[in-house]
């Protein structure tokens, strides 16, 4: 290692330690009324120009702090979905500055997201510095006064402290922190554009622990041609096999997707990746109260992955499952063999209805109770028995919005529909 590389590494370590010290300095400071008014005065600006502000913030942060690059998907910056969700968060924080309790559910989602990505306390000062300096640079000088910036500095410090403490509690309960090296042990094509990747610890002495059905892991990839490592989240697509000491994820090829195309075209058995501990609250729930209650499951496309262990576990528990599965077409539908085996084993307890949006004709298979060559619609949902069932749903955002909206119209309480969103999402 050259002296330049050593100096750079020492500088990186010193910077990380400095950020960690800053993070430890966060404490809750009650905002006075004058400071709250400064935060409220931000509302019109955030409503009209919030995305422009957060877009500039991300450009500043990602351009000056390479250590945070792995945590962000470039596609989400290009589509502005990441800036939009931050603008949404800032706006609602300002609107609720007098009482943040109404944001508790949203903040819980942030904690889950951060833990899944293994966000650390030392990242918060970076975000705070870039956010405040972006405000100072972009907002008019008569708005971004020292008092205005001080109010936002205090408000951000309060938010950071809440999130850091909440995330710390979750980290303490996890079997490991950070990313452990795992080796690709097997690759299986599940359909024309879905590939399953089996991952086992590089160190055979390292034992994986139980994961709740429905949880996901973050995988740290090193892609040739990229200047930095990059993270992606994947649901565990089977019941975790602790005996074989491995996880399974399943990756759909996305047009233009850097990571998904690498997985499909270049990933090999023996390759090494970093894997986080399982995380997420979209999990199978078992209790004395619901032991005899049926499950109603909706999956759109690759959204089937977390439902595989959820459905399997429910059937093993003796519960009935009504499964509505939507795919683009027959050749892209993954896990055909799994569906066949499950249907043959649980003939009476598993009802399977499939929807293919791109096919004019599909031969009904023995395993399928009903096939539709169209997208799921209101009439399909009206025919379902919605009384006393646990509802699980995962798929594209628009798909989930539609299904949940229609279920609510039919009398289902919104909080009864369990779902999860990957990537930036505005509730």
Curated annotation (Swiss-Prot):
Binding site for heme b: 114
Annotated site (Involved in heme-bound ligand stabilization and O-O bond activation): 58
SUPFAM superfamilies linked: Ferredoxin reductase-like, C-terminal NADP-linked domain, Globin-like, Riboflavin synthase domain-like
Region (Reductase): 176-427
Enzyme class: oxidoreductase
Keywords linked to the UniProt accession: Cytoplasm, Detoxification, FAD, Flavoprotein, Heme, Iron, Metal-binding, NAD, NADP, Nucleus, Oxidoreductase
Protein name as it appears in the record: Flavohemoprotein
Domain writeup: Consists of two distinct domains; a N-terminal heme-containing oxygen-binding domain and a C-terminal reductase domain with binding sites for FAD and NAD(P)H.
Function recorded in the entry: Is involved in NO detoxification in an aerobic process, termed nitric oxide dioxygenase (NOD) reaction that utilizes O(2) and NAD(P)H to convert NO to nitrate, which protects the fungus from various noxious nitrogen compounds. Therefore, plays a central role in the inducible response to nitrosative stress. In the presence of oxygen and NADH, it has NADH oxidase activity, which leads to the generation of superoxide and H(2)O(2). Under anaerobic conditions, it also exhibits nitric oxide reductase and FAD reductase activities. However, all these reactions are much lower than NOD activity.
CDD domains: FHb_fungal-globin, flavohem_like_fad_nad_binding
PANTHER family: FLAVOHEMOPROTEIN
Domain Globin: 30-168
Cofactor: FAD; heme b
Domain (FAD-binding FR-type) ranges: 177-285
Family: Belongs to the globin family. Two-domain flavohemoproteins subfamily.
